[in-house]
Amino acid sequence: MLGKTVLLPLLVLLCHSLASASLVYRGADISSLLIEEKAGIEYKNVNGQTQPLENILKANGVNSVRQRVWVNPSDGSYNLDYNVKLAKRVKAAGMSVYLDLHFSDTWADPSHQTTPRGWSTNDIGTLTWQVYNYTMEVCNTFASNGIDVSIVAIGNEIRNGLLWPLGKPDNYANIANILHSAAFGVKDSTLSPKPKIMIHLDNGWDWSAQKFFYDRVLSSGANLVKSDFDLIGVSYYPFYNPSATLSALTTSLKNLRSTYGKDVLVVETDWPVLCPNPAYAFPSDLKDIPFSVAGQTTFVQRVANIVAQTPGGIGLYYWEPAWVQNAALGSSCADNLMVDWSTRQARTSLSVFATI
């Protein structure tokens, strides 16, 4: 009886430990942090104590930070120097760095993939050389600053291509050559160990769209081959399309893994605490989750479970949980943050990362 009494708590602790360690990457994108701090924003932990945001995240189970990198933004936001400063703090807090290369001077997404100033818009050979050199420069700069990088995404949400007009989806050979050049910019850099190389598309729940892209870019007759990249990342937002069900995400991630043999991650996701007038109906299998702090916890746990139960499912990143000057995060939902926008205090939902 004594043996059972001792073993049972140990088994409970072991199971909890295994559950907590199921995802390799438990992350958040906090790219806006330095801009927020410049505006005078200070963050507080759940107990109301002022602390650096990266320390608050680490204490709540976050082990990796995603950073967007722009080429030559007019005001310096998210440029290489900005990201080196942020990454030094991330590493000092004991978390890994994931660089999200937009290959643009501004936002890159399915609706915008603007070629940086000074890069070619009419010669693919010149453009791919510029992509290679820039990617290697970014990686070498991190290496020279003593900053290890775990993941480099070569493009952001590139389902509709990248570096327009040459990289538009009417020419998958161009897209493939751009991605090949970017991948070798990472491989030929001085970073050691080498980062994992990721391709990242939006609408991660839409298997047909994912398959359409990868089948074409890998069969275009250009240079890109499967061995050029290691990871497939997807965005999964619940508030842009009622078809974005958890069931559809499950199918898509499993098919991505089985078809292309890559580890898979959800690298952007959010859940609202306030959404009185959503622009679109929410997916049917998410309607039981409330728009609340508790709802954020439930949502992240459900998505994390789907990733963890997918063979090769290794990570989840919440997008901009602390961007208090932009609580809607571009959606029709008024507040998607894990930090209260008015008090700057961490919400209890932030601790969900310690459970996934």
UniProtKB/Swiss-Prot annotation:
Subcellular localization, as worded in the UniProt entry: Secreted
Entry-linked Pfam families: Glyco_hydro_53
Keyword Phosphoprotein: no
Signal peptide per UniProt: 1-21
InterPro entries: Glyco_hydro_53 (IPR011683), Glycoside_hydrolase_SF (IPR017853)
EC numbers for this chain: 3.2.1.89
GO BP, sorted A to Z: cell wall organization; pectin catabolic process
Domain of life: Eukaryota
GO MF annotation: an example: glucosidase activity
Entry keywords, A to Z: Carbohydrate metabolism, Cell wall biogenesis/degradation, Glycoprotein, Glycosidase, Hydrolase, Polysaccharide degradation, Secreted, Signal
Enzyme active site: 157 (proton donor), 268 (nucleophile)
Catalytic function, reaction form: The enzyme specifically hydrolyzes (1->4)-beta-D-galactosidic linkages in type I arabinogalactans
Cellular component annotations (GO), alphabetically ordered: extracellular region
Glycosylation sites noted in the Swiss-Prot or TrEMBL record: 133
Transferase keyword on record: no
SUPFAM superfamilies: (Trans)glycosidases
Function in brief: Endogalactanase involved in the degradation of plant cell wall polysaccharides, and more particularly of hairy regions of pectin.
Family: Belongs to the glycosyl hydrolase 53 family.
Protein name: Probable arabinogalactan endo-beta-1,4-galactanase A
Organism listed in the record: Aspergillus fumigatus (strain CBS 144.89 / FGSC A1163 / CEA10)
Gene (name only): galA
